[in-house]
């Protein structure tokens, strides 16, 4: 979806939209840390995020890779910067074709900074001289496919600013006229350079309107995180610093936390003044840090740390090819990125009903399913790489996770238990202590309001429902006892399978069972998660593989702990259990063995 469409949609709904900007880190570890931070920030619902191109085109390949992951794994509408620096037309087209094939529809077209070691921009042979050329090229070659954003400079482009007096009136007017040419050439959105004098920005908006620029103009807000960085950035961009800001910073410039808190306060006040004029979108330059940007949005009441809205129980895809997808199997609830990778490239994605458009061709398991960000891998190593002498020791790990003593699990890409799981955490602890090792669960829900902070999704005004669900590993003797007990509970349905594919079940192999649904005004019933026998058979391979490639690999070859995990992998069963009575059912009654 185009960013301009999301901004106009938010304005039509009376909502204030916000967005975050990131830059490509220099190290692999930095990239993984950025994605962990980005995941947390995107949970707050930005309309889009953008990723910069890098000075002189120095990060072109990394920018393309990060943009792809943002759009298709983080599932946030992504806008990629594209510059003319060191970019002949064929490289520009390669970048555009790449993001188009990855389902990205948004570009921020820039001239770009001079290459490293140079003071002035020089047009590369076979390339473009300015952002206007780039906008014209994109529109001429790709028509209306891309949403094109361009930069606006409230104090004029830095090249037009001479000394501390700022740009001359003539230079400022020429810069405005050039901005209008970019919009007339096909740009549909303007995001501004950073500024700290709000009156200058508001005058800039008015001046744009006076010369016929009608598209939305989004203020670029850069929170002050530290004093030296603030001076470096404002010096590079030739940004005016109001005297009151200098006076406020001078006494605290050596106190980094005090500077950050002042930056949050200043950013909040700037945004309040801007929003009061009727502007309904804010763009936050994060510098790859989260605290200041999140602090400003919280102060403005645009987000709540304890109440993150969810359009669906899982984060919807933003890729243009799967944007209508609204049904998924529940099995990957704690491993959403693995699901995205294994379903990448489907011709169709389920919309409305799983059975109508499902594609059974899941991607094969690869190392990607079992690689983790370095920080998460370290946490797993600390919490799960402990000596294991018996299955009771294994059970203790699962129990500790359900009790919140551990914050990671080899079977989850998420941090700790999800809020809704805490409704049943006592029961989960009980059955894990009995040797039923849970990896996925949800409580029964009967008509909770859709804005409930624990189980809500889909926005206000609706009601949500859930069937109680459990997924766990257990030994064969425990499975036999459980199956016998289930016979007394007609509302319970199950599928049990071991690593080799030996299956026990009381449902048809063709059955598809909706386990989550929502009722909203003026809409058909939405059924976003299902239990599907065929998909469970695909998921079981991944789930069993985690015993060795996700946990056992933490121990050396021949280690007794590793051998114990391998034995469990070969002998245990993976069980999917649903209580179809979401009103009076008791899923855990069957475990009173």
Curated annotation (Swiss-Prot):
Annotated keywords: FAD, Flavoprotein, NAD, Oxidoreductase
One function term, GO molecular function aspect: methylenetetrahydrofolate reductase (NADH) activity
Activity regulation information from UniProt: Plant MTHFRs strongly prefer NADH over NADPH. Not inhibited by methionine or S-adenosylmethionine.
GO BP field: methionine biosynthetic process; tetrahydrofolate interconversion
Catalytic residues of the enzyme: 21
SUPFAM superfamilies: FAD-linked oxidoreductase
CDD domains tied to this protein: MTHFR
Keyword hit for Flavoprotein: yes
Sites where the protein binds substrate: 113, 193, 285
Cofactor: FAD
Enzyme class, first EC level, given as a word: oxidoreductase
Binding site for NAD(+): 21-26, 52-53
Any matching Pfam family: MTHFR_C
Pathway: One-carbon metabolism; tetrahydrofolate interconversion
Keyword hit for Thylakoid: no
Function in brief: The probable reversibility of the MTHFR reaction in plants suggests that they can metabolize the methyl group of 5,10-methylenetetrahydrofolate to serine, sugars and starch.
Subunit structure: Homodimer.
Family according to the record: Belongs to the methylenetetrahydrofolate reductase family.
NCBIfam families per UniProt: fadh2_euk
Protein name: Methylenetetrahydrofolate reductase (NADH) 1
Source organism: Zea mays
Phylogenetic placement of the source organism: Eukaryota, Viridiplantae, Streptophyta, Embryophyta, Tracheophyta
